[in-house]
């Protein structure tokens, strides 16, 4: 991916003169080496980005809004690998521009438009991810395929409007062409200050914005992953499995139910048989407050009554946290043919402790009750699995964005630092250093597909299936 041709403005003119002067010193072996290396990089870039685009096209698992932005970035990288790399290699090897003014202007326009579109795609990816993690309730509703297409189109159209007319028609605006026929640079970038201004707008400012956004993305993503992380063994052990603490609900006074009925409880997604509690009656029983909510296939509701776990002094207005009560089993009307799921909320101090009971009407009614309980257990397990999948997606997307931004910064920084230095010292940078720095910008287009594969296992598997012609396995790659 490149954003500047190394031959633009006064710094570009200096580079062109150095290229021309050094050409006579290039030996045949040196030119063959340059052609081999750059040709190989061009081939890898083209193949890699075609794989990216095909993977998103054929694998439905990869057809997400975020990957559509990567598809657009892959298009830009493909153009860089197919055209810009090879034309610049020709310029370096021959030491002059041999293709004339028209091809020169078309190359520069294509190079700048595609490079600017790449930067804007990176900004879109960063902003998209930032809004996803900071506005998870409102932004996803507007994050549609149509919206992604409009944003991608806007990035390309804006890049074209900013660069193509100025590069192609500036000579007609000023009335003459000042670029020699054997050289190729942008005419309106006539001094180092202007070149540095374009570097600020096209590189330094986007890098600052993307870095700040990524810091916020990383912090918000870690917070969400930690929030939805499944409980560990220690956390589960410290928590009473049959009870869930909830805000205090409106109490209602009940009486203790008769004992003797069997009971099942839903605990952490598993159906367990709870033994009948053995709780001796307290010396001075005081009515407890509890709330009972039931649901059953017969739409019946019955009250639940509890035996108080401890006695209260009438002189106390408030009481410290009481021990969690043991729920008493309850019986139903023998004539009822429906089993019920009972949710009992027990007040302990300023909290409520809630448990779920499955109460059979008759032994024959145990089966439907167990089926309902298993359904609830399945729902609980699905929720845990979804939380784990969401955490995995968060990490995967964040890693991919980090890799892309890191590759962009590492490969584009050397050239743009040289642009800054050249503003104050036009003879401080050797010609070969200019060429290497500019080629690093192109190498970014080679690295991006590797970033996708290393950070996303689905991309990696789809790449492998495409390369091995295992087309039947592509749809199952996850």
Swiss-Prot record:
SMART domains: 7TM_GPCR_Srsx (SM01381). GO terms for cellular component: asymmetric synapse; axon terminus; dendrite; glutamatergic synapse; membrane; neuronal cell body; plasma membrane; postsynaptic density membrane. Residues 271-333 are annotated as: Disordered. GO terms for molecular function: G protein-coupled acetylcholine receptor activity; guanyl-nucleotide exchange factor activity. InterPro entries: GPCR_Rhodpsn, GPCR_Rhodpsn_7TM, Musac_Ach_M4_rcpt, Musac_Ach_rcpt. The chain crosses the membrane at residues 31-53, 68-88, 106-127, 148-170, 193-215, 401-421, 436-455. Residues 1-30, 89-105, 171-192, 422-435 are extracellular. It holds the Pfam family 7tm_1. It is found in: Cell membrane; Postsynaptic cell membrane. Disulfide bonds join 104-184. Its main location: membrane. Glycans are attached at residues 8, 13. The modification Phosphothreonine is found at residues 458, 462, 476. The keyword Translocase does not apply. PANTHER family: 5-HYDROXYTRYPTAMINE RECEPTOR, MUSCARINIC ACETYLCHOLINE RECEPTOR M4. Belongs to the G-protein coupled receptor 1 family. Muscarinic acetylcholine receptor subfamily. CHRM4 sub-subfamily. The muscarinic acetylcholine receptor mediates various cellular responses, including inhibition of adenylate cyclase, breakdown of phosphoinositides and modulation of potassium channels through the action of G proteins. Primary transducing effect is inhibition of adenylate cyclase. This is Muscarinic acetylcholine receptor M4.
